[in-house]
């Protein structure tokens, strides 16, 4: 009997999901992306070679794994084909093992133009999007006007829908944002090439997944971004445009909730965030700079520097509740090597001195909150590339044990470096 495992980020993304998904695919036959778009970069480092995947599931680097892009993903044909060719240039056989949902909404050039125009227009109030058209594409989906992958294979239907849709979006671009219009004819010509290249890879992903399930194969669902970027449960409005919580597997891949066996939450041993929005434990001092430098905290897709701070157990507790997380994987423990003191936020305090054990639901409500910290001693020894728990420094083990105690959940995996083998496995999700 196969097992179905979900891997998702418990913070603001960039937790190291790509490496862990790649590691776990040694026990999986299928890997599925079920939400987000090419705004998420999953970084893998195998035998010293770094690979950044944006749309294609991280299981693609395992030759016997079938990968799916499900209907919850907004798909840029241009970005996908570019990524396929990049991997093929490195000797990876992509097209025979990648399948794409006919129901994926398309990201087209006008979505990107709208995204960039809006961010420029908002100035200092900008959300800090990646400018890749993700939000506008999801807007079209919710407004029931999106073009989907399946439309590409019906030329007249696609042209009629695109003409009407482009008329609307070009009006907004030119009249409101004062930006150039997107050309219809060139987009139609480009779409012909997309259709030809994508046709062999499309399918009904939900139906395929249930066939894999019935055959007893292990399926791994790979989340993008993190819980606090969720459009409903994140630090709204500083969020992404999709649901990043575990429930997105159900809608975004057409996979029933009772079939999910295990949810693995990925968290860094500290906290990071990209772009604007609240960040209670953010460090603006030399410690924050040191963590950023040691952790090489720059966005895999955008290259933007990440904000760094202490581990926030208040946020993690809510992540665990929202996603019924079975166990945690703590990443980048080695980044904390050499620090004299470590801090864990165990609560927040408002301006009146009231102690809050849960994060607020709106971004503005974080403004007057300060973290309440618990201090623990650091360690001077290196934890890099350690693969046995007992070989970790005593204070590192104590730090991890305290996280388990505060959160009430086990740490099942521990990452001590970017390579596949730099991992401590305490309990495997597929066991």
Swiss-Prot record:
Keyword field contains Ligase: yes
Protein's name in the database: Adenylosuccinate synthetase
Binding-site residues, IMP: 14-17, 39-42, 130, 144, 225, 240, 304
Subcellular location: Cytoplasm
Annotated positions binding substrate: 300-306
Binding site for Mg(2+): 14, 41
Oligomeric form and interacting partners: Homodimer.
EC number: 6.3.4.4
A GO biological-process term: IMP metabolic process
Originating gene: purA
Protein purpose: Plays an important role in the de novo pathway of purine nucleotide biosynthesis. Catalyzes the first committed step in the biosynthesis of AMP from IMP.
GO CC term, one of those recorded: cytoplasm
GO MF, one example: adenylosuccinate synthase activity
């Amino acid at each position: 009997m196969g097992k179905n495992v979900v891997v998702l980020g418990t913070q603001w993304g960039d937790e190291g999901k790509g490496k862990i998904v790649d590691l776990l695919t040694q026990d999986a036959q299928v890997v599925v992306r079920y939400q987000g778009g090419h705004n998420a970069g999953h970084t893998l480092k195998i035998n010293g070679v770094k690979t950044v995947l944006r749309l294609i599931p991280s299981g693609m680097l395992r030759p016997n794994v079938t990968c799916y892009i499900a209907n919850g993903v907004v798909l840029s044909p241009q970005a996908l084909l570019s990524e396929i060719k990049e991997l093929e240039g490195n000797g990876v056989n992509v097209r025979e093992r990648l399948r794409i949902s006919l129901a994926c909404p398309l990201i087209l050039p006008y979505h990107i133009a709208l995204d960039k125009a809006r961010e420029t227009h908002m100035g200092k109030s900008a959300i800090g999007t990646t400018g890749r058209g993700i939000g506008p594409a999801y807007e079209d989906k919710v407004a029931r006007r999106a073009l989907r992958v399946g439309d590409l294979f019906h030329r007249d239907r696609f042209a009629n829908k695109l003409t009407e849709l482009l008329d609307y979006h070009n009006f907004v671009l030119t009249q409101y944002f004062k930006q150039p219009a997107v050309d219809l004819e060139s987009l139609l010509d480009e779409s012909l090439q997309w259709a030809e290249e994508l046709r062999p890879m499309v399918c009904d992903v939900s139906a395929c997944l249930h066939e894999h399930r019935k055959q007893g194969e292990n399926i791994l669902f790979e989340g993008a971004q993190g819980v606090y970027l969720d459009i409903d449960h994140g630090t709204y409005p500083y969020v992404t445009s999709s649901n990043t919580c575990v429930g997105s597997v159900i809608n975004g891949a057409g996979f029933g909730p009772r079939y999910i066996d295990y949810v693995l939450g990925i968290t860094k041993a500290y906290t990071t965030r990209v772009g604007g929005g609240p960040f209670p434990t953010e460090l603006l001092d030399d410690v924050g700079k040191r963590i950023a430098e040691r952790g090489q905290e720059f966005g895999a897709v955008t290259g933007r520097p990440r904000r760094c701070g202490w581990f926030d157990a208040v946020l993690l507790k809510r992540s665990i509740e929202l996603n019924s997380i079975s166990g945690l994987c703590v990443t980048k423990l080695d980044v904390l090597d050499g620090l004299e003191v470590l801090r864990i936020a165990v609560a927040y305090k408002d301006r009146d001195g009231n102690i809050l054990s849960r994060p607020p639901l709106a971004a503005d409500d974080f403004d007057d909150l300060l973290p309440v910290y618990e201090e623990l001693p650091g360690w001077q020894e290196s934890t890099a590339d350690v693969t046995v728990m007992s070989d970790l420094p005593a204070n590192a083990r104590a730090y991890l044990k305290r996280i388990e105690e505060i959160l009430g959940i086990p740490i099942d995996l521990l990452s001590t470096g970017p390579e596949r083998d730099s991992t401590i496995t305490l309990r495997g999700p597929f066991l």
